[in-house]
């Protein structure tokens, strides 16, 4: 087992990893930018190293400075968290080249799954259902049109190197096709430096279902059930829950088997997530595999009782999984609300500032993952997510009621958050009944804004 780990991240995920390491008697090294010198993860770690200026490119994306910090402080491994360098194959390879362990999959696997069109081909070969679309890339309008004529409208044009909803456009007719293609291609080039594109049939009103995978370095691959991540705004998740209300035991078994096949087909190791869309007729299709720990991993921890961060560290140290698929059972229901420093009633504008006072919810079945504290000044340079409120209860309805209580207890003074919008969603009849898909926010936002006045 590792004696010391560097956490190549910031915010609540860095705090989360530090806490797991402390419970495993592993020393931790935090990195920070000059904007984060008073951050909570810096205070909690055993050691902390400044790796650059406020801009992410100068600090949290500064590969050489991060690896130098790890080597000079005597670390054996680097945990990348999520975001920043977590899915950067060059970083993963560089870490290994420098004699350290990257807590995640191999760089070549990150490459293969990061290219969405290649990942699609890999899944077809592994026997995993994929949405009808192009076999490989479409890099000219003529190639695109030829595929679309076969699969029909509507379609979704996507960047092969894409993620986070960028480099992606819908087209409902031929009139929209060329503009959608050129716009998505230009955005992909600007965001990822790669304008390789592919196209899929657009699945209308889908649910976004993902399966948590654990794969050790001894060939053992299992899944830990699913998460329903359908409550999204502009392809960014807001509320996640586990398990999914609409999945029966038979469908869960089939989708779980497909998720395991996907990981096996990719030669995957460590924690990963296989994402599917589920249509209105319960047909499911692979969309991508995320090669890192997810923001929403706590809800899987709540229903399985398995600490995913500790499992990542155990796997990276060479230990085999200590449980088998038949040992995994889902107990009760868990919901997570992402608390962002933004104003949902004014076009979700960012709202950084100083936290003048904070009170976190408590009581049975309530967990809060955050890096906030009273007096902390939120930097302007980074992601707006400041906390995750997670609840667990015996049933879904009890979990909804528990989350309402938790949100009503949460007080963060000095900055505006999306807490009120989350509270509204949890009172929407369609949400309570489980009648929602990825267009839920888009459909109900105006109504919720008008209710807020």
Q: For the regions a protein language model found, what residue spans apply to each?
A:
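Conserved beta3 strand of the protein kinase N-lobe
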Residues: 133-134
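Alpha-helix initiation/capping motif
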Residues: 59, 84, 112, 137, ...
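ATP-binding N-terminal substructure of ATP-dependent carboxylate-amine bond-forming enzymes
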Residues: 1-125, 138-146
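Acidic/histidine-enriched active-site and ligand-binding environments that engage anionic O-linkages
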Residues: 147-156
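ATP-dependent carboxylate activation and anion-phosphoryl transfer catalytic cores
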Residues: 7-23, 48, 71-73, 96, ...
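A short acidic, helix-capping loop that chelates divalent metal ions and anchors anionic groups
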Residues: 165-167
């Amino acid at each position: 087992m590792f004696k010391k780990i560097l956490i190549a991240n910031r915010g609540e995920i860095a705090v989360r990893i530090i806490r797991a390491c402390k419970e495993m008697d592993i020393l931790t090294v935090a990195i920070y930018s000059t904007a984060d010198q008073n951050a909570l993860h810096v205070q909690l770690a055993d050691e902390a190293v400044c790796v650059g200026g406020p801009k992410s490119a100068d600090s949290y994306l500064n590969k050489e400075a991060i690896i130098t910090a790890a080597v000079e402080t005597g670390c054996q491994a680097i945990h990348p968290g999520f975001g920043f360098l977590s899915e950067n194959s060059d970083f993963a390879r560089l870490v290994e080249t420098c004699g350290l362990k990257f807590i995640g999959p191999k760089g070549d696997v990150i490459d293969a799954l990061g290219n969405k069109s290649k990942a699609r081909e890999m899944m077809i070969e592994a026997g995993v259902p994929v949405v009808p679309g192009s076999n490989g890339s479409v890099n000219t309008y003529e190639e695109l049109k030829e595929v679309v004529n076969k699969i029909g409208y509507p379609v979704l044009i996507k960047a092969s190197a894409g993620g986070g909803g960028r480099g992606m456009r819908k087209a409902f007719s031929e009139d929209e096709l060329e503009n959608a293609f050129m716009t998505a291609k230009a955005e992909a080039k600007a965001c990822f430096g790669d304008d390789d594109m592919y196209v899929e049939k657009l699945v209308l009103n889908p649910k976004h279902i993902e399966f948590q995978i654990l794969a050790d370095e001894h060939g053992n691959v299992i899944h830990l059930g699913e998460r329903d991540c359908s409550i999204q705004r502009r392809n960014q998740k807001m509320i996640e829950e586990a398990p999914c209300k609409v999945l029966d035991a038979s469908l869960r078994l089939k989708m779980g088997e497909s998720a395991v096949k996907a990981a096996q087909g990719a030669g995957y190791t460590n924690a990963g997530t296989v994402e599917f869309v589920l249509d209105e007729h319960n047909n499911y299709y692979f969309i991508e595999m995320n090669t890192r720990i997810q923001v929403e991993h706590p809800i899987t921890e709540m229903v399985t009782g398995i600490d995913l961060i500790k499992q990542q560290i155990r796997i990276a140290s060479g230990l085999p999984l200590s449980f088998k698929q038949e040992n995994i059972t889902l107990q009760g229901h868990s919901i997570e609300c992402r608390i962002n420093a933004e104003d949902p009633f004014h076009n979700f504008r960012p709202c950084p500032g100083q936290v003048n006072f904070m009170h976190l919810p408590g009581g049975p079945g309530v967990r809060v993952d955050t890096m906030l504290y009273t007096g902390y000044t939120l930097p302007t340079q980074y992601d707006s997510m400041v906390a995750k409120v997670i609840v667990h209860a015996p049933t879904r309805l009890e979990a909804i009621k528990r989350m309402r209580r938790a949100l009503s207890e949460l007080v963060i003074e000095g900055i505006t958050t999306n807490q009120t919008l989350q509270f509204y969603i949890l009172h929407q009849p369609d949400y309570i009944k489980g009648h929602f898909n990825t267009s839920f926010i888009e459909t109900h936002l105006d109504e919720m804004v008008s209710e807020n006045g």
